[in-house]
Amino acid sequence: MTKAQFKSGLFAFMKYLPFGKAILKALYLRNFPSLQKNVLGLRFSNPIGVGSGLDKTGSFYDEIAAIGPSFVEIGPLRDVHTAIATLQAEPKDCVVFADLSNSGNIERGFSLIYDFVDAVVFNASSNTNVLATMDRIITLRRYNDVYKPIIIKLFPDLKDEQYKEAADYILRNGIDAVEVIPTKVGLMLELTHNLVPVISYGRFSSYEEVAQTLDDGAQLVALSYLPVKDGFHYINGLLQKLSKK
């Protein structure tokens, strides 16, 4: 069993444990009013979220939210139906992004889950042509009464000229936000002329790394990794330090 599977298993266990979510909230969920912010037309209780990879089915995002993140990125979803069933049955305790990059039919997955999440994420790497698909996704969004943000996540295997191409596409087509690794935050802000919110994602192992990427201009931080040694307290510890900055 990998560390990621172990952590996912812990949250799944807390979902089915009687009062599991309530226990997590009582132990780890704290309010930091000074960290609240509005991004993408959405209200975030703080800038820290959990990126895709931990809740790959959209089954226990509320249990993850109970330890402090303001948003959870579910997926990459292979099948949106499990996530939709959970989203229909349980009120969301946080902002929920859906990563549809592993969905067999991205356009169908987008249409099905659109009404149930707060934003949708698509991955762009050197071996995918996601921007071609995005034209159809943007068209589909126009048929919905409620506007939901679309986020493009740029993988680190892209070359700088591909970041430039992506930035041009984002500006030209009204993509709402972009996710990049910490070392590309400054580049993307420059390429988009500070017109598009940047979300920094990756394995942040310390408060200093999180604080630095926020200082570099990231609006939000999506943690791709929760250190096992710090347990459920990790995010709360980050928020306590950020609130004192």
Give the label of every model feature segment.
Residues V80-C94, A132-I152, P156, K184-S200, ...:
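Alpha-helix-loop-beta-strand connector modules within alpha/beta enzyme cores
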Residues S59-I64, R108, L158-R172, E190-L195, ...:
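Catalytic cores of alpha/beta
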Residues I64-I67, I84-D93, G109-V117, I137-D145, ...:
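Acidic (Asp/Glu)-rich catalytic clusters
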Residues P47-V50, F71-E73, D93-D99, D118-V121, ...:
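Structural preference for beta-strand elements that scaffold enzyme active sites
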Residues L100-E107, N129-T133, P149-L171:
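Active-site glycine- and acidic-residue-rich loops that bind
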Residues V72-D79, V120, A124-S126, A177-T183, ...:
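Glycine-rich phosphate-binding active-site loops on the catalytic face of alpha/beta enzymes
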Residues S52-D55, D99-N102, L154-D160, P197-E208:
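Glycine-rich beta-to-alpha transition loops that act as phosphate-gripper elements at the mouths
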Residues M1-G104, L238:
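N-terminal capping/small domains of soluble enzymes
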